[in-house]
């Protein structure tokens, strides 16, 4: 994704999609905090829908595509995805392989980057 512009790195804390069951009583504010944190996380994910992402995987491959959805196991679905192989001593990275729709298992994700331009959107006239 050469020349695609600056990116913003997203990092997960304590597991990307973990959700704890809350056994809160009427006077328990911990349940309310968990609900509001879950709501904020959902809103942040919704804001990333249809944005261009670069996902680095444990085997060295990189996938670039449009973020379509995720699930509670942290699997990610990318649309219009392209796969870039990790360059090694025996060969250099060539043309990307077009995958189209791709599911990336959450346990293979090392990092996710979002293209900054796709976050702000193009200027409208």
Swiss-Prot record:
Region entry Disordered, spans: 1-42
GO BP terms: negative regulation of apoptotic process
Residue spans of biased composition, Low complexity class: 15-28
Residues recorded with modification N-acetylalanine: 2
GO-annotated cellular components: cytoplasm; NatC complex; nucleoplasm; nucleus
Subcellular locations according to the entry: Cytoplasm; Nucleus
Residue ranges occupied by any Sm domain in the UniProt entry: 40-118
Coiled coil: 31-56
One function term, GO molecular function aspect: RNA binding
SUPFAM superfamilies listed in its UniProt record: Sm-like ribonucleoproteins
Keyword annotations from UniProtKB, A to Z: Acetylation, Coiled coil, Cytoplasm, Nucleus, Phosphoprotein
Principal subcellular localisation of the protein: cytoplasm
PROSITE patterns tied to this protein: SM
Residues bearing the modification Phosphoserine: 22, 25, 29
Similarity comment: Belongs to the snRNP Sm proteins family.
Protein role: Auxillary component of the N-terminal acetyltransferase C (NatC) complex which catalyzes acetylation of N-terminal methionine residues. N-terminal acetylation protects proteins from ubiquitination and degradation by the N-end rule pathway.
Quaternary structure and interacting proteins, as annotated: Component of the N-terminal acetyltransferase C (NatC) complex, which is composed of NAA35, NAA38 and NAA30.
Protein's name in the database: N-alpha-acetyltransferase 38, NatC auxiliary subunit
């Amino acid at each position: 994704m050469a020349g695609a512009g600056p990116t913003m790195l997203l990092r997960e804390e304590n597991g990307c999609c973990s959700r704890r069951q809350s056994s809160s009583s009427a006077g328990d504010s911990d349940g309310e905090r968990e609900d509001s944190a879950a709501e904020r996380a959902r809103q942040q994910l919704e804001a990333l829908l249809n944005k261009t992402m670069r996902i680095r995987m444990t085997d060295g491959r990189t996938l670039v595509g449009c973020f379509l959805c995720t699930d509670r196991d942290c699997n990610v679905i990318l649309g219009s995805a392209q796969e870039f192989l990790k360059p090694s001593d025996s060969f250099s990275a060539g043309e990307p392989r077009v995958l189209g729709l791709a599911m990336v298992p959450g346990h293979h994700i090392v990092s996710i980057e979002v293209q900054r331009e796709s976050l702000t959107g193009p200027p409208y006239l």
